[in-house]
């Protein structure tokens, strides 16, 4: 008890065991050595220590590089599935397992099969379809999404396979089996460069066929024309296997009852074309574009819900083609033997190639027919003829048409042409006659339908209408029932409601340039008729459809030549008396005067009237052979002028020979005028003002005036100067507000992104933000895309 008290007292006195232990010097705790916590313990730096550290780092990096290189070499040359059987077996097992898993998922979810099939298609098919599938998936409606895949996408893929089978025939596949011609099987997927290479290979194959035919047939030096024709037949047979009609095939082919001798002189130019790579490029590129367009029609990418009349790809290609043509016209000029020059762009714009001139001429012709009908007491009837449903690829709601038989746009046009030819033959046999104009235009899916403005005797109207209805509905009659309106629709024009010219004016304008139809909305597509004019023009160019055709009247080419002759005579005679005759024959001069005045009614009557055979017309177009041969050795036919059976000789309207040459451009002048837009050279492309300042010249003196002086200046301006100033002010685009931005929902944003992607843009967030802030994106040919009123629009005047 006493010891415990002493121990407790000692512990309380010394402050515990730790304090008691630290009281002795030999038991004092020592500080741990930690260079990270105590920088003072670091060894002093020296040049040697730094050099050693750098060497250590270099050695470490070199070791890592060697190890990496060793691993890459091992994996590339040894450890891969092609050399290591174990690795190859493991890779095969992995792929098989992945395929089984995907197959199992597709068995329980058939939608994945459809998506996989879409992804396996070429880019021009899969990209727009996947964008639409992505859009439907983003809506969050599972049943609607699955229904869209099953009811729309799967039938589209089935139709696509049928279209491909119809495009590639057995003979076409046989040609593709030759060495180097395998690309024929994927012709719709090629671009222009690939088609050019393929056309070179096809031309080489034709050359080898000709060499083989010559070796088999030409056994002696004395070659007969019939042997040359047999060699041509072999090369032509090879071309026919590619679905291409050889040149001069109708004149050179074998016929049982040939009335005229065989034109052997057509064989050399025909062979020259079939051995030319450029000729094959034009044929194959046309075939590629048509096949590609039909495939897009098969998957419902050409309709009013996607792209009306024709695909966006074809529209963009047409814009680019028009832009290149315009650049070509601007860079060339025409020159004659005397050295006179004409700007090629001005010549083209002054010709009938100008849409405005073409529209004005057709409207004047229709007006002339209207005046003649009033004079004769004829009635006017407006007919609409449509193809059967088997020619229509898409329904009105944008879904696949189950009755479509993979018929092409060209086949629908040929159907209407054949129907009209059969009707015309029956009409002439019945003693019925008519005259008028026919307009061919597309449905929203590209199928052709016709509008006819016909003038006839009132007593023949019912007979002609009944006969035309009989031929228009004779095929697939059971699908119409009692209502024949979807296939054939006649409408008697009431003069109280409008004239025949007013009926046809809209159809002529919307199929050329859409003049005056900016506010007219198409009932079929829901878009402005002026905006649809570009699609219609691209559709007619791609499918080679003749849009306008007049019948029962004299030719319009003679009308143009007479107007040209009248202008030439006015320039030669100078100050001649008004109404003075130009031609010696009064009857011919009367026809020329009517054409010069632009009165089609008088011109037609002076030519002999309507419903008169061509052999009885007074003035006709004269043709002649070209003086210089073409690149293929033949002399083409060109217009010489006019001729008449009641007068001797021909009248030449193209006496001056013009040649096409490239304009001479001064590079220094172009650089000084255009600044940074000039071609890249060693000179400085600064703006002209900066160049002037650097060269020591004086800056241009810009006159300023106060408000009173400005008012006086504007008050003293003439009417012409005011118009010019107003026109310049209209060209100034207003500044866009920086804070302006349209507010749209997420669904509208997704729809905008899908539309941009369908038109060939990226549809990125930056593009969408630019459009929402009031900006625009160039789409080619001077047009721009902008977003206004929650709708994507395209125009060349988007600011106005």
From Swiss-Prot:
GO terms for biological process: DNA replication. The keyword Nuclease applies. Keywords: DNA replication, Endonuclease, Hydrolase, Nuclease. InterPro entries: Replication_gene_A-like (IPR008766). One of its GO terms (molecular function) is endonuclease activity. Its EC number is 3.1.-.-. Signal peptide: none annotated. Pfam families: Phage_GPA. The keyword Nuclease applies. It is an enzyme of class 3 (hydrolase). The active site is at 503 (o-(5'-phospho-dna)-tyrosine intermediate), 507 (o-(5'-phospho-dna)-tyrosine intermediate). Belongs to the phage GPA family. Possible endonuclease which induces a single-strand cut and initiates DNA replication. This is Probable replication endonuclease from prophage-like region.
């Amino acid at each position: 008890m006493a010891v415990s008290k002493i121990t407790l007292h000692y512990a309380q006195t010394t402050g515990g065991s730790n304090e008691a232990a630290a009281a002795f010097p030999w038991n004092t705790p020592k500080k741990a050595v930690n260079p990270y916590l105590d920088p003072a313990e670091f060894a002093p730096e020296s040049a040697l220590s730094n050099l050693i550290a750098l060497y250590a780092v270099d050695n470490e990096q070199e070791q890592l590089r060697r190890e990496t290189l060793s691993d890459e070499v091992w994996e590339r040359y040894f450890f891969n599935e092609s050399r290591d059987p174990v690795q190859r077996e493991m890779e095969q097992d992995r792929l098989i397992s992945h395929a089984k898993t995907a197959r199992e998922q597709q068995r329980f979810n058939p939608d994945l099969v459809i998506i996989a099939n879409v992804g396996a298609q070429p880019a021009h098919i899969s990209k727009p379809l996947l964008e639409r599938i992505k859009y439907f998936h983003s809506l969050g409606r599972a049943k609607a999404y699955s229904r869209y895949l099953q009811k729309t996408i799967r039938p589209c893929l089935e139709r696509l396979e049928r279209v491909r089978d119809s495009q590639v025939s057995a003979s076409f596949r046989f040609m593709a089996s030759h060495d180097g011609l395998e690309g024929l099987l994927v012709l719709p997927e090629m671009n222009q460069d690939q088609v050019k290479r393929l056309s070179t290979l096809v031309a080489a194959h034709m050359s080898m066929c000709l060499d083989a035919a010559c070796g088999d047939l030409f056994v002696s030096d004395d070659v007969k024309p019939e042997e040359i024709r047999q060699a041509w037949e072999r090369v032509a047979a090879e071309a026919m296997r590619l679905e291409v009609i050889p040149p001069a095939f109708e004149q050179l082919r074998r016929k049982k009852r040939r009335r005229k001798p065989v034109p052997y002189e057509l064989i050399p130019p025909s062979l020259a074309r079939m051995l030319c790579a450029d000729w094959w490029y034009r044929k194959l590129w046309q075939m590629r574009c048509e096949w590609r367009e039909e495939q897009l029609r098969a998957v419902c990418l050409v309709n009013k819900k996607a792209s009306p009349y024709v695909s966006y790809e074809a529209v963009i290609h047409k814009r680019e083609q028009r832009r290149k043509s315009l650049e070509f016209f601007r860079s060339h000029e025409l020159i004659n033997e005397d050295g006179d020059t004409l700007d090629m762009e001005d010549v083209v714009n002054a010709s009938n190639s100008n849409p405005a001139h073409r529209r004005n001429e057709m409207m004047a012709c229709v007006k002339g027919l209207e005046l003649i009908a009033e004079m004769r007491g004829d009635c006017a009837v407006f007919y609409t003829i449509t193809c059967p449903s088997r020619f229509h690829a898409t329904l009105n709601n944008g879904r696949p048409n189950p009755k479509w038989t993979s018929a092409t746009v060209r086949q629908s046009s040929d159907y209407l042409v054949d129907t009209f030819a059969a009707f015309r033959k029956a009409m002439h046999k019945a003693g019925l006659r008519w005259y008028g104009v026919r307009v061919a235009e597309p449905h929203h899916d590209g199928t052709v339908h016709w509008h006819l403005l016909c003038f006839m005797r009132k007593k023949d109207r019912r007979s002609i209408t009944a006969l035309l209805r009989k031929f228009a509905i004779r095929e697939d009659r059971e699908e119409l029932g009692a209502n024949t309106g979807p296939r054939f629709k006649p409408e008697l024009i009431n003069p109280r409601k409008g004239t025949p010219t007013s009926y046809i004016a809209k159809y002529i304008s919307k199929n050329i340039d859409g003049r005056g139809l900016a506010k007219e909305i198409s009932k079929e597509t829901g878009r402005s008729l002026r905006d649809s004019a570009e699609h219609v023009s691209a559709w007619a160019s791609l499918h080679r459809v003749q849009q306008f055709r007049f019948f029962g009247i004299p030719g319009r080419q003679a009308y143009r030549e007479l107007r040209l002759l009248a202008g030439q005579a006015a320039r030669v005679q100078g100050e001649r008396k008004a109404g003075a005759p130009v031609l010696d024959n009064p009857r011919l001069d009367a026809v020329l005067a009517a054409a010069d005045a632009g009165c089609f009614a008088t011109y037609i009557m002076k030519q002999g009237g309507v419903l008169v055979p061509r052999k009885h017309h007074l003035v006709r177009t004269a043709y002649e052979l070209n003086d210089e041969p073409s690149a293929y050795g033949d002399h083409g036919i060109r217009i010489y002028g006019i001729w008449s059976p009641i007068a001797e000789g021909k009248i030449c309207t193209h006496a001056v020979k013009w040649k096409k040459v490239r304009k001479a451009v001064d590079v220094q002048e172009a650089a000084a005028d255009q600044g940074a837009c000039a071609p890249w050279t060693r000179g400085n492309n600064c703006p002209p003002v900066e160049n002037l300042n650097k060269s020591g010249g004086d800056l241009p003196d810009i006159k300023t005036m106060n408000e009173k002086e400005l008012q006086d200046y504007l008050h003293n301006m003439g009417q012409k100067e005011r118009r010019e100033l107003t026109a310049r002010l209209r060209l100034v685009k207003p500044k866009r507000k920086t804070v302006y931005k349209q507010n749209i929902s997420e669904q509208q944003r997704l729809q905008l992104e899908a539309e941009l992607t369908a038109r060939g843009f990226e549809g990125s967030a930056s593009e969408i933000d630019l459009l929402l802030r009031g900006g625009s994106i160039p789409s080619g040919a001077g047009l721009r895309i902008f977003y206004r009123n929650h709708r994507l629009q395209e125009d060349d005047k988007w600011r106005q």
